[in-house]
Each structure stands twice: as structure tokens, then as C-alpha cells.
Amino acid sequence: MYFSILQLPFLIYPVFGNFDFTGYTMVSKIAGAALLLAIMSNFALADCFDRAGSYYSIDPDYLRAISWQESRFNNAAINGKSAGGTTDYCMMQINSRTLADLRREYPSLNKDKLYSSPCLCIHVGAMLLRRNFNKYGLSWLAVGMYNAGMSNKQTSIQNRYNYAMLINDHYKKIKAGIIQRPHIE
């Protein structure tokens, strides 16, 4: 069965709602539901950086910038050459000493879980950055402490500053599209 273009508005009315011939716009419950679904799916489509950023009130591109600096978004990354003989795990390079401290609060948290769940790794990194912000304020000092720790030695102070400036540079490149945002579930 074929329909002319003039018959189309009458055919879609029962399904989609009212059709306004003057503005050629359609008002319907289905269109509203589709809009709501599209808005809701943005959160469902959000990757782990977006969800962790939202949960910890941190711009997710800062989390991406840290992950880029620490591992180039590689969740299998490991660094066994950290200061004090510690090891850093997963894409957010969670330090083994920090992980041991976190196990007091989260006994089941371990390096295997960080490696098997990139999203968990991102959330742990976001939590650590949020704790730095809560303790030291929303500052580059807090960002620098993510990597260089809290020591007040001159080299640590310089390392914190250098790290923070690297993160800021990566952040700008992510915003500009020079560093591509990965979609990590």
C-alpha cells in the first residue's frame, strides 16, 4: 500500500501524537520519551573516566590527563622503579604503598583487581586525587602530589610542580582533541 506525502501526517497521528501543519512540528509522548532516553543514555554511554569524574566531582579530562601521563591509557602498565622500592599498577599507576594503605579501608582491593578492571583503577585514582583536593585544596599542589607525594624536600617540590604542569599540558591537548579520549568501560 502506498501513501502520498499529504496522507503521512494523518497516518502518524495515532502513533506519534499531534502534527502541526503550520510549523511542520510534531508534539508527541514518543518524541518526549525519545528525548529523555537520549539524555539518559548519555550517562549510560559515559565511560569510566566520565563516571568517576562525576562521582568525585573532578573534570574527567583531568583524570584522562593523569592516565595519559602515567601509562598512555594502558591498564597493563607496571612501574617497578618507583622511589622507595615500591611498584605502581594499572593505567592510573596506583602505588603499592598507597594500595596497602587503601586495603585497611577496602580489604578486598588488590593489584589483580586493578588490572582486571580498568574502571576500578580509574575510580581508585579519582578517589586519591579527590582526597588530595580535600586535604590541600583545588590546586596544582594537590595534582602534583598524586605523583610526587608529600615530602617537602626541594626535589619533591620541584617534581610536584613539573608533574602538575605536564598534567595541565595533557589536559589542554585532550580538550583540543590532540590526545584522543579513550572510551573505557
Where are these regions (language model features)?
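Catalytic glycan-binding domains that act on GlcNAc-containing polysaccharides
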Residues: L45-E185
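Cationic, low-complexity basic patches in intrinsically disordered or flexible, solvent-exposed regions
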Residues: L8
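Sec-dependent signal peptide recognition
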Residues: S4, V27-L36
